[in-house]
UniProtKB/Swiss-Prot annotation:
PANTHER family: RIBOSOME-BINDING FACTOR A, CHLOROPLASTIC-RELATED. Monomer. Binds 30S ribosomal subunits, but not 50S ribosomal subunits or 70S ribosomes. GO terms for biological process: maturation of SSU-rRNA. Its main location: cytoplasm. Disulfide bonds: none annotated. The keyword Iron-sulfur does not apply. The gene is rbfA. This is Ribosome-binding factor A. It is found in: Cytoplasm.
Amino acid sequence: MKKLTSENSHRQQKVASIINEALIEILHRGKMLDPRLYDCPLTITKIIVTADLKIANCYFLPFNTKLTPQEITESLNNSKNAIRNFVTGKINMKYSPDIRFHYDHGFDNALKVEQLLKDTNNI
């Protein structure tokens, strides 16, 4: 039985890195994307590729935008096929991973923890 580890293999990290570079390039160009993404600066915070390299979970953080995280996720998912085709051209694999977009709640959670710590210090 195969041992499950939380560590990513070198191959997973390499695929995540290539996907990250391709995402940055296509988001910068803005071609073939949902029009709502044109004026929506995004940071790709992390990409986690499954062990079988079939799924890439991409976490993003928007900056200075009027769109909600749900609207941005919807826009990215509407553009998923164009993004996947672009990534396929950059990656040398038999199958291109399915790209799934998620809002990164890490920053929001850090702010909540910081506020809780401030509140407890004031007691």
